[in-house]
Regions:
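Active-site acidic/histidine proton-transfer and metal-coordination neighborhood
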Residues: 32, 57-61, 67-149, 156-158
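Histidine-acidic metal/acid-base catalytic patches
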Residues: 1-6, 11-31, 83-88, 132-151, ...
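Glycine-rich, proline-tolerant flexible connector loops at the mouths of alpha/beta enzymes
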Residues: 34-52, 56
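Acidic/polar N-terminal loop/beta-strand segments that form early-domain functional surfaces
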Residues: 10, 36-38, 67-68
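Aromatic/hydrophobic pocket-lining residues that form π-stacking "cages" and hydrophobic walls in ligand
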Residues: 21, 51, 80, 108, ...
């Protein structure tokens, strides 16, 4: 396993313009990112070439975009796929509402085939209907491998799922990861911490990825310290480098 370490651009949401964002990413110690909607307009495919050119000039690799909330309507969702094709992006982390599960997912699969894009469902915690293994297992039984899992370790913990066991269970559909860690206050409110210092067993999780020769986007996410995220993110990067 020889993966490029990326950081979710949402971690730098305070730095909204690309000229502000790029130095922050570099200061954290990486040259790759999963781009969120703060730093690109995925609804406008015509913007993709210029955005991609700015990333190329800054020598920053886009490993994925997301998380994108898809409607299941072919025409409505198509611009996001067109954006990815124009920008040369091959991975998108996604979510969708329950009413999109049947006909909507067929449309999403059709778009993924048409634009040669790998999609990964983002499990967004205990409050999210896609946060538990049972529903994910059902969805994967009804879809092709164009739709896989973009596993968020902290939100798995929030849904009382073991992220190590979840990675093992869905290893053949694991197409991306958000490496993120939580600790909780007495009221069960989560707080982001440096990866491996909270509940996540980071060495065991990385062992699962290495044994499977995981090759998807490897993305750090730390949502704390919005106005000054670099110190914590730098520590996250250092920790992950020791385990990749």
């Amino acid at each position: 396993m020889n993966q490029t370490i990326a950081i979710q651009s949402w971690c730098f949401r305070h730095f909204k313009s690309l000229p502000e964002f790029f130095p922050q990413l570099a200061a954290a110690g990486v040259t790759a990112t999963e781009v969120c909607g703060v730093h690109a307009n995925f609804a406008e495919p015509a913007s993709a070439a210029d955005t991609a050119a700015q990333f190329k000039q800054a020598r920053v690799k886009i490993v994925a975009i997301g998380v994108e909330y898809l409607s299941g309507d072919y025409a409505r969702d198509k611009p996001r796929f067109e954006w990815c094709k124009a920008a040369g992006v091959k991975n998108m982390s996604i979510s969708f509402k329950p009413e999109s599960m049947f006909d909507g997912l067929q449309n999403v699969e059709k778009l993924a085939d048409e634009f040669d894009l790998q999609l990964g469902i983002h499990n967004h915690g205990g409050y999210d209907w896609l946060g538990n293994s049972t529903i994910l297992e059902y969805i994967f039984s009804k879809t092709s491998k164009r739709i896989g899992l973009h596993l968020d370790t902290a939100w798995a913990i929030d849904a009382k799922q073991n992220p190590v066991e979840m990675a093992e269970k869905f290893i053949d559909r694991l197409v991306g990861v958000h490496i993120k860690d939580f600790l909780y206050d007495p009221h069960r409110n989560p707080g982001d911490v440096i990866i491996g210092t909270g509940i996540l067993d980071l060495p065991k999780f990385m062992d699962v990825l290495k044994q499977a020769n995981f090759s998807g986007p490897l993305v750090i996410e730390y949502e704390g310290d919005e106005k000054n995220p670099v110190p914590a993110l730098s520590e996250c990067v250092k920790k992950l480098h020791t385990l990749v």
